[in-house]
């Protein structure tokens, strides 16, 4: 075995998967996982752990995989992570744990994410649950939002002995895991629902269809319902648009709405009561993971799909793996291109999009080179659907109905990065509601930090 080269992971064939919503990556079997784990040199001062936002003891769990002790490996992971089967699939490991791996200096880094996924899937298939609390604290904590931040915070607090209730605005728990990430990347029934069941097995209660700020306020939860502390993990669900002419035309969607229709409402299924527009030629404006998800969803619904992004491929914020999969499946990348107007017919339906070519100038405040228009390079793309994937911001409903809870100019809740503490006594926050749209694992890290902060607050 070549220890410098990682064990390849099996995937659905690109042509076949472009026509279905089944999971693309098939993961490792036990033999492959043990072989990959055997490449790990078990560093004493493991940099991979420092690269993990939830600080999983990576060398320890990989050692147990190498020895064939998969259940023990799972318990090591679940001490730190409430959602290992999710993280193993959607975390940007290449820039976090795997990006710090010593093996990667000369050769391939250890496939930490694929090993985490294998362990979590094995545990699920064998009915193994995470270890729960040994003693109860007798105090109630409310968690707002059942996405990655909320589930992580709730799981950690339940393990610490608190009586935790999650309040979810939608009819189904999971947050962005169920409405934002497609089935072909993250199966809902086989993976997400089972991870949520694991959190519930710790004693966490989940109430759906509860909109905090309408159904009940944070002050009412604390003053009338007996909750000693509240964690806000409500995410960032308000889509951003470009503000160009024609954006209100029929056939223009936010990626948020488009993906929610497909993922949560199962609109890709012809029998679904919630329709989705099956465009023939679709442009997705943006270059992040959400743009890739929307583009690959539209492709599976039968469209010719173009990614329109104003910078070059090097600046694409999406994971390398997602870009690679999109290209394999036949999605066209129109880079250094920026929309200026959406064109519609007399009935208001999209027929095209005016664009201008761009070139890269000096770096901006983000460190990426600023795109500059190329004079005289305007052209029109013929389209029937445009999906805007330009990021999201938090819904101001909670902050506007909670006295003493301060936000910044982007309506993000102001919270201490170390412990999630907000400007309101007993109220903590983390994830996209604080940072704006970011990754699943960063939201989990924030939920974990807030759980520790709440425990310290309630232990005084």
Question: Locations of the language-model features?
Answer:
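Residue-level detector of alpha-helix initiation sites
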Residues: 82, 147-149, 172, 288-290, ...
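Glycine-rich dinucleotide-binding loop and its adjacent helix/turn
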Residues: 119-135, 192-214, 239-301, 408-418, ...
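N-terminal Rossmann-like FAD-binding beta1-loop-alpha1 element of flavoenzymes
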Residues: 140-165, 291-299
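A conserved FAD-binding loop/helix module that cradles the flavin
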Residues: 433-459
């Amino acid at each position: 075995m070549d220890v410098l080269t990682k064990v390849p992971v099996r995937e659905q064939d690109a042509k076949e998967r472009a026509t279905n919503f089944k999971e693309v990556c098939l993961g490792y079997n036990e033999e492959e996982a043990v072989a990959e784990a055997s490449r790990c040199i078990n560093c004493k001062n493991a940099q991979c752990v420092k690269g993990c936002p939830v600080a999983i003891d990576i060398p320890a769990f990989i050692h147990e995989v190498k020895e064939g002790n998969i259940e023990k490996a799972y318990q090591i992971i679940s001490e730190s992570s409430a959602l290992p089967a999710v993280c193993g699939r959607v975390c940007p490991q290449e820039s976090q744990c795997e990006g710090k791996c010593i093996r990667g200096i000369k050769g391939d880094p250890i496939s930490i994410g694929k090993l985490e996924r294998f362990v979590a899937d094995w545990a699920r298939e064998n009915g193994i649950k995470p270890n729960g609390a040994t003693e109860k604290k007798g105090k109630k904590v409310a968690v707002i939002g059942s996405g990655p931040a909320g589930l992580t915070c709730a799981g950690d607090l339940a393990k610490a002995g608190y009586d935790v209730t999650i309040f979810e605005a939608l009819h189904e728990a999971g947050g962005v895991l169920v409405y934002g990430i497609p089935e072909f990347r993250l199966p809902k029934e086989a993976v997400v629902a089972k991870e949520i069941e694991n959190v519930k097995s710790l004693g966490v209660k989940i109430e759906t269809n509860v909109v905090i700020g309408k159904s009940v306020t944070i002050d009412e939860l604390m003053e009338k319902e007996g909750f000693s502390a509240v964690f806000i993990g409500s995410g960032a669900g308000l889509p951003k648009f470009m503000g160009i002419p024609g954006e209100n035309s029929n056939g223009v969607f936010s990626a948020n709405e488009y993906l929610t229709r497909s993922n949560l409402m199962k609109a890709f299924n012809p029998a679904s009561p919630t329709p989705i527009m099956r465009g023939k030629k679709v442009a997705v404006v943006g270059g992040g993971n959400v743009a890739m998800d929307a583009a690959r969803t539209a492709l599976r619904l039968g469209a010719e799909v173009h990614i329109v992004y104003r910078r070059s491929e090097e600046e694409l914020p999406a994971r390398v793996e997602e870009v690679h999969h999109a290209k394999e499946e036949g999605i066209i990348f129109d880079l250094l291109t920026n929309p200026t107007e959406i064109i519609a017919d007399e009935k208001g339906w999209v027929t095209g999009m005016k664009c201008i070519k761009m070139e890269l100038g000096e770096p901006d405040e983000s460190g990426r080179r600023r795109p500059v228009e190329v004079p005289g390079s305007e052209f029109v793309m013929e389209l029937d659907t445009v999906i805007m994937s330009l990021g999201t911001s938090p819904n101001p409903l909670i902050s506007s109905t909670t006295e003493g809870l301060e936000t910044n100019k982007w309506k993000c809740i102001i919270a201490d990065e170390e412990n999630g503490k907000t400007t309101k006594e007993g109220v903590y926050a983390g994830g996209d509601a604080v940072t704006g749209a970011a990754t699943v694992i960063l939201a989990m890290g924030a939920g974990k930090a807030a759980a520790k902060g709440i425990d310290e607050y309630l232990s005084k």
